[in-house]
Design a protein with these regions (language model features):
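Interhelical loop and helix-boundary elements at the membrane-water interface
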Residues: 1-16, 55-78, 130-157, 193-207
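C-terminal membrane-associated helical module and adjoining short loops/tails
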Residues: 138-230
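Multi-pass membrane catalytic core of lipid/isoprenoid biosynthesis enzymes
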Residues: 9-13, 56-130
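Helix-coil boundary and interhelical linker segments in multi-pass alpha-helical membrane proteins
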Residues: 21-37, 84-119, 165-179, 221-230
Length: 230
């Protein structure tokens, strides 16, 4: 078979599996955005450590390294580009199936093509961001330099941005689903904006993982013990 299958790529493959399952489960029936957010966090967890794990193998060939870069970007597009869109679609459909309330009426009054446009803009921005990062990473590799900063918001930030928004819906006691799509547009703009972010070290990664784990636990609590399922 073509490709590579040693332990250095397992987390990337697991992230893609999590994203794929999340996409289908999220869009089942009336829509389950909270479940989708849980899968999104799992993708973020895998992404946080896939590079660290890959670098533990000594003597990786240039082909193995390039393969790892390619599958990482392709997986990120599915996990942090497509899955948040599916969560947004599930959010729209779950609101449509709720009992009448002012927020649901607001959602119903907006033509669905508007939401599709938001989804397209978001995925396109994520793809452009990933492709641009690959170009810069390849140039740095040719010069023998390590990537120390990111240009634009990394797409993996989606794993920590969207789940808290779903939790916020419960904390405020009312449906603020419409703002999810505004956040998507803002994040899309940040993906392609020209500003630099320092690449986090191990300590920074562990802090983000801790935040993600907390979000994951809270989402499960809300999903199974909350007053209502969204």
């Amino acid at each position: 078979m073509i490709g590579f299958y040693d332990y250095t790529v397992w987390l990337t493959y697991l992230s893609l599996i999590s994203a794929t399952v999340g996409i289908f489960v999220t869009r089942c029936g009336p829509g389950y955005p909270n479940i989708g957010a849980a899968f999104l966090l799992l993708c973020g967890l895998c992404d946080a450590f896939d590079g660290i794990v890959a670098r533990t193998k000594q003597g990786r060939t240039p082909q193995e390294k390039k393969f790892g870069i390619q599958i990482d970007s392709l997986t990120d597009l599915v996990a942090f580009g497509v899955l948040p869109v599916c969560i947004g679609d599930a959010l729209y459909r779950s609101c449509a199936n709720m009992s009448p309330n002012p927020e649901a009426q607001i959602m119903a009054g907006i033509p669905y093509p508007f939401f599709v446009t938001v989804f397209v803009i978001y995925v396109l921005a994520a793809m452009i961001r990933l492709a641009y990062f690959n170009v810069l990473a390849e140039e740095s590799s040719e010069k023998g330099e390590a990537v120390k900063t990111y240009t634009g918001l990394p797409v993996t930030a989606a794993a920590l941005i969207f789940p808290p928004f779903l939790l916020l819906r419960h904390l405020v006691g009312r449906d603020i689903a419409i703002f999810y799509y505004g956040v998507m547009l803002l994040v899309a703009a940040l993906f392609v904006s020209r500003f630099n972010i320092r690449k986090p070290g191990l300590k920074g990664v562990l802090i983000m993982v801790g935040v993600g784990v907390l979000e994951f636990i809270l989402i499960l609590v809300v999903r199974y013990y909350g007053a209502r399922v969204l």
